[in-house]
From Swiss-Prot:
Extent of Polar residues compositional bias: 240-249
Organism this protein belongs to: Homo sapiens (Human)
Name this polypeptide is given: FERM and PDZ domain-containing protein 2
Keyword Isomerase annotated: no
Annotated tissue distribution: Expressed in epithelial cells.
PROSITE patterns recorded: FERM_3 (PS50057), KIND (PS51377), PDZ (PS50106)
Lineage, opening ranks: Eukaryota, Metazoa, Chordata, Craniata, Vertebrata
Length: 1309
């Protein structure tokens, strides 16, 4: 759109109103507003007569000329103009109800001048406007067009004011010339000092104006570019759209009129924006939010706009490209003329196109610096420039010259005649494991934009339900909450902007529109950044999150075989492509990768576990080398994140290129830190709350030199706060790195918790701001125990919810100590950190502790003791009060009983939190007190198969009293370490909990996963006298024995086969098959078979002996529905003759996806009432931990993955009524897992599984977000399939075997 007035074009003698305000740094005076009002009204009337008023009046379209005139330009960003558009234009009108252009301009002009009058005015301070001017502006900004004053009446009011001011009033043009002179004079001075070699005065002025505008806005760090970046120049036509002032709305006084502030206005808070707000006389409204940046960038305006129906990246993609010039020192110092420059198109993540003027010899790094400076990005580590080839993105090195990768003809031909378009894309190259690691909201927004587009373009796999949920979250982020005035069945958004085309084709656009609208209506209120953060939380759980996929071929080049390599920060994934779906076949983590090499077109990965070489063929040697460099860069990024360096520090990729196949001893000598990390299986994961501030890093706290008094200083001086994201603050926590001793010859690190003096074995913790760390010693009371009640954190589904003190028992030891307060988190007990401990593990640890315990607690600052208000708040947050607990009879004296007692306590609803948490029953096991005079040790708790338990053994004669077998160098399944035998009368036999066949998971904090047999033995025979073991029960205990020194339990008990000790599939499958059995033949179409299925767990119905696979939904117009014989709820007994009996979820999924075109299903229709009805509504996934990249370790050269899935993911429940995306309440719980079958780009999660998910139920759940409406549903299971492996089971010291359902477990000591 061209400027529509004769002075509209941006020239050397014209500036925008926004530029003048930014340079000036303060609001317009009253006389200046009168002058602008007069000149603008005249110009608008003239443009309306000439039918040339096709523009929106706003601070960026109002051009002030040096001659003292005012005009308007039409070349303004839609995002910037939107807040000043009249409401009737935003709402849309029918063809026969065209709005009055004059009235729309009146509204926009009034909003623009009111915006200028409130520029940089504090929220609490009223505007200094006289009554006549204030009344005119308020009348111009009326919501209803018929209530606004006309342009003629505005002119008349200006003439009346001119007569009343003075005998000799200053001309209106004089105020305009002063504003223009302020800007142009400033530019001239800076121009002379900074830029001397540029041949274009216009381009210098554009660049310096933009730099000045951005530099003067200091209220928002994100609005300023890093000083180290090279400057760039923007053409005059695009300068003022980048950075502009934003006023604070303040008091409107002395007026009988009212002003409707649209939610599109900058500075308004979300609640008031949504409903609209009337600012009337005598009322004070502080609509400005200090969290919003002063400079309203496109990002800021997008968050505060109203009734937008299109996403940001679609709106900006349709606009004309903005011209960006590289700095003069780059393109002109060699004497290059302007015409010798070439046009390079750079597409930003928000869809905006930049036309970069550059030299043919310019480097990618120079373009990257200019583009990121233009986009105001600060955390540059994660971004890169890439070009597209065959629908794949290839990132460029910063030193690469553009002429080396430009298309043919781009270098030779001048820009005016060149028909070859050279396009680069600014994209995210390195993905963080959690958005909390991103320090700036603008960076998080860029992640949101890329993931949003990748899902829409089907580059990132999602199943159907998650696609719909993400569509709703994107709608909330970009549109807002469901409009109250919305008429049912009337569309208010474009379906294709939020849902991928394949799903629309499968479900029909009308049905998608209805379902998304209904989910939007019922979803909890979210707005702006909060919705974006929730969007990121869900996408970061997807198995393909952060994976850069490139097509490769097998070494034998079979035409029917399609393969792809996925490279991410954790390693390399090998995919097999079938039916447009990617199936993960192999996974190589960096620690399992011995060598990556290339030779011509061949790309080879050598496994350090099996020694096998896996060779793939690329389309060219250049691609092969690129994949090697990409692996090196991703490995380096992962090492940088794991080392605790600040994420904004750029790292040198060359430091991580060396990936030779060294021996373990050599690797240990050369890189001890990496070797320790590899052995500990930590995979360099960072917990989100372990960030420091801007100079942050990993808060590494050891058990050394714990000093309570010094913790306050450390907390005040050395700790930065975790980033706040929206209304949700990520609470910081201490990272407990347990002391490790390392020997390059012996191999694995051995924990030395007991080596050295007692002081050296203590941990130091650093208090968060507003909190303190206390150390207290308690003595057990025979009646009240230790006198406090503990519970798991409010959000127990996350990776480390923590152990908290919910209340203090009156008269107990804790109350007498006068230092413990409810709500405090127990960090350590008897010098053992509780980080990563589950509730049950903490219960056993406290119950088995001696009569004197030492606690390290982090609690809020204040007077010690029990504050009734604090206790009330604490118990309200946890949902369990001490009174409630005592009413159940759970007092400390119960622990003196000599027999095991199992009690079922019904979970209480969380007080004060509207959350879709289904009721469930949780079993607590209590351990008796140790009896000194008992000849028989206390009977241990009943531990079910698959449960993890904690044992502390004191060595006798240097032994623990049991032998082990297994290791990755043995034939034991999955390379685990198992208890082979129990020595009669030894420490293990006396303790009584350990059984033959149990799997040993951890010894003194050292994870045994991935270790050889010798290394595991070395861990067990470490120097410490007390060994703290974490084990997994493999077989149920048949009888409890009271062993003594004379018992021959080990001899009498037959050896347990390690194979049979592993939980296997049921020997038989007794399905509900009383109904008729029938066979159906289906033929796949482009969308698959056209149905989704769920796996119903046997725990959901008492009469089931095995899992059932049931059809959940039939998609309209697809083969399953067209067949007519299949109905929702039918049981799938077999697929192509292979029975589903005993198969786990992933195997059924792969069985259906890998089937040929014609599929034969053996179905059974259960009798009515035999099984619960399937819920067809949508459910909300648990917004939980970031998935880990994993692959199973094989001892042979297996070609299919061995993947583990956490046992707890098999538990699912339908939500109760409340907030979230669940639509209607359900009283019954269902244990189901669902997979949508029929999406043309849907990727199954694994090709085959060789063992059941019960094998490793202790998988770690990292970075679990604290969310008030977290649920575990079938969606979560879909998200988490194929995300775990034996070698990546858990992070150091973290375990989670509880149900992912949010629960509150309490006990008293």
């Amino acid at each position: 759109m061209q400027p529509l007035t004769k002075d509209a074009g941006m020239s050397l003698s014209s500036v925008t109103l926004a530029s003048a305000l930014q340079v000036r740094g303060e609001a317009l005076s009253e006389e200046e507003i009168w002058s602008l009002l007069f000149l603008a009204a005249e110009q608008l009337l003239e443009d309306l007569r000439n039918d040339s008023s096709d523009y929106v009046v706003c601070p960026w379209s109002a051009l002030l000329s040096a001659a003292g005139s005012l005009s308007f330009q039409g070349r303004v960003s839609h995002i910037e103009a939107a807040p000043f558009k009249a409401p009737e234009l935003l709402q849309g009108q029918s063809e026969d109800e065209q709005p009055d252009a004059s009235q729309m301009h009146v509204y926009s002009l009034g909003m623009t001048l009111y915006w200028s009058a409130g520029f940089h005015v504090p929220p609490h301070q009223p505007l200094q406007l006289c009554e006549p001017l204030h009344s005119i502006l308020l009348t111009m900004c009326e919501d209803q067009p018929h209530r606004r004053c006309t342009l003629q009446s505005v002119l008349e009011a200006c003439r009346v004011h001119e007569k009343e001011v003075s005998v000799y009033p200053a001309p209106a043009g004089l105020h305009i010339r002063r504003l223009v002179g302020l800007v142009l004079g400033t530019i001239s001075e800076v121009e002379k000092r900074v830029v001397e070699e540029s041949s274009s005065v216009q381009q210098n002025r554009s660049y310096l104006l933009r730099k000045r505008l951005r530099g003067t806005s200091s209220e928002s760090p994100a609005a300023q570019a890093p000083e180290c970046l090279h400057p760039c120049r923007v053409s005059e036509r695009s300068t003022e759209t980048q950075s502009s002032p934003e006023p604070h709305w303040s008091t409107l006084t002395h007026s009988h009129c009212s002003l409707l502030v649209n939610r599109a206005l900058p500075g308004a808070d979300p609640q008031d924006q949504q409903a609209g707000r009337r600012l009337s006389s005598g009322s004070v409204h502080s609509a400005a939010d200090s969290s919003w940046p002063t400079t309203p960038s496109q990002r800021g305006f997008l968050q505060r706009r109203s009734k937008f129906s299109r996403p940001e990246f679609i709106l900006l993609a349709g606009e004309a490209p903005m011209t960006l010039h590289l700095p003069g020192s780059v393109v002109t110092k060699k004497g290059k003329s302007y015409l010798a420059l070439r046009d390079l198109c750079v597409v930003l993540l928000n869809g905006q196109h930049l036309e970069v003027k550059c030299d043919v010899e310019s480097t990618v790094g120079a373009v990257f610096n200019a583009v990121t400076s233009f986009a105001n990005l600060e955390e540059l580590t994660y971004f890169g420039l890439a070009y597209m080839k065959s629908k794949e993105f290839f990132f460029l090195d910063s030193e690469t010259r553009l002429c080396k990768i430009a298309p043919e003809g781009w270098r030779e031909q001048p820009q005016k005649t060149s028909m070859n378009t050279f396009t680069l894309f600014l994209r995210i190259k390195f993905f963080v494991s959690h958005y909390g690691l991103l320090q700036h909201s603008l960076t998080r927004h860029q992640f949101y934009l890329q993931l949003r587009k990748d899902i829409l373009e089907e580059r990132l796999y999602c199943n159907e339900e998650i696609l719909l949920q993400l569509g709703v979250l994107a709608l909330q982020a970009e549109f807002g909450n469901y409009p109250k005035e919305q008429v049912e069945s009337k569309p208010y958004f474009h379906v294709e902007d939020y849902i991928p085309a394949s799903l629309i084709e499968r479900m029909t656009a009308l049905r998608v529109q209805v379902e998304v609208s209904e989910m939007h209506r019922l979803s909890s209120a979210l707005w702006g950044e909060d919705a974006e953060l929730k969007f990121l939380r869900v996408t970061q759980q997807l198995p393909e999150y952060g994976v850069l996929v490139h097509q490769v071929f097998s070494e034998k080049r079979r035409p029917e075989e399609e393969m792809a390599l996925g490279i991410c920060a954790k390693g390399v994934i090998v995919y097999e492509v079938k039916n447009n779906s990617r199936i993960a076949m192999l996974r190589f983590q960096w620690r399992e990768t011995g060598k990556i090499s290339t030779y011509q077109k061949k790309f080879t990965i050598t496994s350090s576990v099996t020694g096998k070489k896996h060779t793939f063929v690329t389309d060219s040697a250049k691609t092969s080398k690129y994949l090697l460099d990409l692996c090196s860069a991703q490995h380096g990024f992962n090492a940088q994140m794991g080392s605790g360096q600040p994420s904004h520090v750029l790292f040198d990729h060359d430091k991580f290129v060396q990936m030779a196949n060294l021996s373990p001893a050599h690797q240990a000598r050369s890189k001890p830190l990496i070797w320790i990390q590899r052995l500990s299986c930590s995979e360099n994961e960072l917990f989100v709350s372990r960030l420091q501030g801007a100079a942050g890093g990993l808060l590494s706290t050891s058990m050394d030199n714990f000093n309570v008094d010094g913790s306050k200083e450390a907390g005040a001086e050395g700790i930065g706060r975790s980033p706040c994201t929206g209304r949700e603050q990520l609470k910081s926590a201490c990272v407990i790195q347990k002391p490790m001793t390392w020997d390059s010859l012996s191999g694995p690190p051995v924990q030395s918790m007991h080596a050295g003096s007692k002081n050296n074995r203590r941990k130091s913790f650093i208090a968060e701001p507003g909190r303190e760390i206390v150390r207290v010693t308690l003595k057990r009371d025979p009646h009240r125990g230790f006198g406090f009640v503990i519970n798991e954190g409010e959000y127990s589904g996350q990776a480390d919810p923590g152990i908290f003190i919910s209340s203090i028992i009156p008269g107990g030891p804790a109350e007498k100590a006068k230092t413990i307060k409810p709500g405090g988190q127990i960090l350590a007990l008897n010098h053992i950190s509780l980080e990563g401990f589950t509730f049950n593990m903490a219960v056993r640890m406290i119950q088995n502790s001696p009569d004197n315990i030492e606690l390290i607690i982090s609690q809020s600052k204040g007077v010690g003791g029990n504050n009734p208000d604090e206790e009330k708040n604490s118990t309200a947050n946890s949902g369990v009060s001490s009174t409630d607990i005592l009413s159940f009879g759970y007092q400390g004296s119960l622990l003196s009983h000599t027999q095991d007692q199992d009690r079922n306590t019904e979970e209480l609803d969380m007080a004060g939190v509207q959350s879709l948490v289904p009721r469930l029953r949780h079993q607590l096991s209590f351990l008796p007190l140790k009896g000194a005079g008992s000849s028989c040790p206390p009977s241990p708790p009943e531990i079910s198969a698959g449960e993890i338990y904690f044992v502390e053994l004191v060595k006798e004669d240097g032994t623990l009293g049991f032998s082990v077998t297994g290791g990755i160098n043995t034939s034991v399944p999955y390379g685990g370490i198992y208890v082979k035998s129990i020595v009669p009368g030894g420490p293990a036999a006396k303790e009584g909990q350990i059984l033959q066949g149990d799997r040993l998971l951890q010894v003194d904090g050292v994870i045994l996963c991935g270790l050889t047999h010798k290394q595991a033995v070395q861990c067990l025979t470490g120097p410490g006298q007390v060994a703290r073991l974490v084990l997994e029960r493999r077989v149920p205990r048949s009888t409890q024995q009271c062993p003594s020194a004379n018992d021959s339990m080990g001899d009498e008990r037959t050896a347990v086969s390690l194979v049979t000790a592993l939980p296997g599939r049921p020997s038989s499958c007794v399905s509900v098959t009383d109904g008729p059995k029938f066979e159906v033949k289906l033929k796949k179409n482009a969308n698959g078979l056209g149905f989704s299925f769920v796996q119903m767990e046997k725990e959901s119905c008492s009469h089931l002996k095995s899992d059932l696979v049931r059809i959940k939904r039939l998609f309209p117009g697809q083969p399953a529905e067209e067949n007519g014989a299949i109905a929702a709820g039918d049981i799938i007994l077999a697929v192509n003759g292979r029975s589903t009996e005993g198969l786990i979820f992933q195997e059924v999924l792969h069985l259906l996806r890998g089937a040929p075109q014609e599929v034969t299903l053996l179905l059974c229709r259960p009798p009515p009432g035999a099984l619960p009805e399937l819920e067809q509504e949508w459910q909300t996934p648990e917004l939980s931990a970031d998935k880990e990249f994993t692959r199973a370790t094989c001892t042979d050269s297996c070609t299919s993955p061995i993947l583990d899935q956490e046992d707890s993911w098999r538990d699912s429940a339908s939500p109760d009524a409340g907030e979230g995306l669940g639509l209607r309440p359900e009283s019954s719980q269902k244990a189901i897992r669902e997979a949508q079958w029929g999406q043309n780009r849907e990727r199954p999660w694994a090709s085959s599984l060789t063992h059941s998910p019960e094998s490793h139920p202790h998988l770690c759940k990292l970075h679990q977000e604290r969310d008030e409406s977290t649920l575990a549903t079938s969606l979560e299971k879909d998200v988490r399939q194929n995300c775990y492996s034996v070698c990546d089971i858990m992070r150091l010291g973290r375990y989670s075997f509880s149900s992912p359902l949010t629960r509150l477990s309490t006990d008293i000591f």
